[in-house]
Amino acid sequence: MVLMILPFIGSVSVSESLVAMITMCLAYLILKFFRTEIPEGLRELPGPKPLPIIGNVLEVGRNPYLSLTAMTAPRTDVFQIQIGMRPVVVLSGNETVRQALIKQGQEFAGRPDLYSFKFINDGKSLAFSTDGPAVWRARRKLAYSALRSFATKEGTTPEYSVRLFEHVSKERYAAISMFMKLMADFDPVRHIVVSVANVICGMCFGRRYDHNNRSWLNLVNPRRDVRKVVASGNPADFIPILQYLPSTTMKKFLNINARFNEFVQKIVSEHYTTFNKDNIRDITDSLIDHCEDEPMDPMPDADDKIVGIVNDLFGAGFDTISTALSWSVMYLVAYPEIQERLYQEMETVMGPDRMPCLSDRTQLTLPEAFILEIFRHSSFLPFTIPHCTTKDTSLNGYFIPKAPCIYIKQWPVIHDDDDVLDPSSFNPDRFLKADGTEVNKLNGEKMMVFGMGKRRCIGEVIARNEVYLFLAILLVQLQFHAMPGEPLDMTPEYGLTMKHKRCHLRAAMRRGTEE
C-alpha cells in the first residue's frame, strides 16, 4: 500500500514535504483528541493499532482481500483499521453482512465522501455519489423503472423474444467471427470486452461499433482502468494532502472519465432531439420517457442525472459482465472435462440445430451452477463498493459512529470453511441439488456479486441473463484450449474487480455460424 502511494507524490520539494508532514501530524493529533465517546452498553471496535499518519497500510499491503481476511480470524466479523488518516470499519461473515445490509439497511446505505468518487460521472453517479436519501431514491426509482421497461421489451423481429437476446445474438456473430480468424492464437479478453461493450451500447444507445474501430477501442479499453483507481486503497482518498500533489494516475483517471462523459453527453443530447414517445429505442429513450411521465421533484438537473445513470449502467455492467465472461473462458480451459459436460447438457436440452435462448435457462442447471461457481471461486469482486453509516449505530454489540468508510468483504463470505465444503476446489456441482436437476437457491444466494439490501445492483437480472446468454452461445459453437506448452496463470490481479492475467488461447469450431 505504501508503494501505491509513491506514484501519487511526483516531484515535491523538501520544504513542501515538511509542511505536508507537519499538517498531517497536527490533523492526526486533532482526530485523536476528538474521538467519539462509546455509549454505555456497547463495545469499542477491535482492530490493530494504527501508526501515526499512515495507519495500518503496512499490514493491509497490496492484496487487502487476503490481508483483511487474515485479520478477521483472531478478532471478529466486525473490526476497524485505519488507512492513512481515515478509520475504516471492515465487515465479513454471511450473518454479519446480512444484518448490516438487510436488517439495518438504512443505517449502512450511505456512500463515503471519498475524493475519487467526486470525479465519477462528474459527481452524479448513482452508484458512487453521496446524494441525500430523497435524491438517491428518486434517481434509483427512475433507473429501475427504465431498466424494467426495457428488460421486458420485445425484440424487433419475431425471432427474438426480448431485446437483450437480440443484442447478444447479433453480437455473437462478430465475436465468433473474430475468434475464428485468430483460431490458433487469440487474446479472449480483447474481444469479450468489445462484445460486451457493444451489447451494453446497443441496449443503452441503440448502436454498436466494429471490433477494430480504433476510436471505440480507445474509449472502451481504458474503462477497465477506472475500477483500479476506485479500488480499496486509492491513497488520495485516505491521505488528504495527496489530493494537492501531482499524480499521473489521477490525471489518467480524470481524463478517462471526462472523455467517456463527453461521449455519453453527446449521445443523450441526440436522443433528446430525436425522441419519440411512441418509439422507445433503448434505455436512454426509456429514461427520458420516465422523466417526462414522472418528474423527479427531489432530483435537480434531470438531464445531467440521465447522463450519470446511463454512464453508471454502462460502466458497472460492462466491467462486471466482461470480467465474469473472461474468467468463464479461463475456467473452461482449465477444466476441459467440465467444458464438455456443459456442452453435452446444452445439446441434450436444445438439440443440435438451434442457439440457446433465455427460456432455456431454467432447464440448463449445470451452466447456471458453473456461473455461480465462477463467482465464488474467482471472487473477482472481493469487496462491495465502500459504504458508510448514515447515523451512529451498532452492530454485533460494537459501536459504529456516523460516516466512517465501511468495507464489506465478499471474499471470505464465499470462501468460509464453515459454509463451503473444500472451498479451494472448483466444483460447480456444489450449487446443484443431489439429483442434479435443480440449482440450490440457498447456496446461490450467498454469492453477493451484485450486492444486497438497499444498494443492490438494479441491473442484476439483465447482467445475469447476459452472462448466461454469452456463455451458452460461445459453448455451443466453440471449444476452447490452452496454448501448447503455456500453463494458465489464474492468479488474480487486485482491483475493485479482480482480473486474471492476459493470455492467449486456441479455439475449435463445434457448429457452423450462419450469417
From Swiss-Prot:
Residues that hold heme according to the record: C457
Tissue-level expression: Expressed in induced liver, kidney, gill and gut. Weakly expressed in control liver.
An MF annotation (GO) of this entry: steroid 17-alpha-monooxygenase activity
Domain of life: Eukaryota
Keywords linked to the UniProt accession: Endoplasmic reticulum, Heme, Iron, Membrane, Metal-binding, Microsome, Monooxygenase, Oxidoreductase
InterPro entries: Cyt_P450, Cyt_P450_CS, Cyt_P450_E_grp-I, Cyt_P450_E_grp-I_CYP1, Cyt_P450_sf
Protein name: Cytochrome P450 1A1
Protein's organism: Pagrus major
Gene: cyp1a1
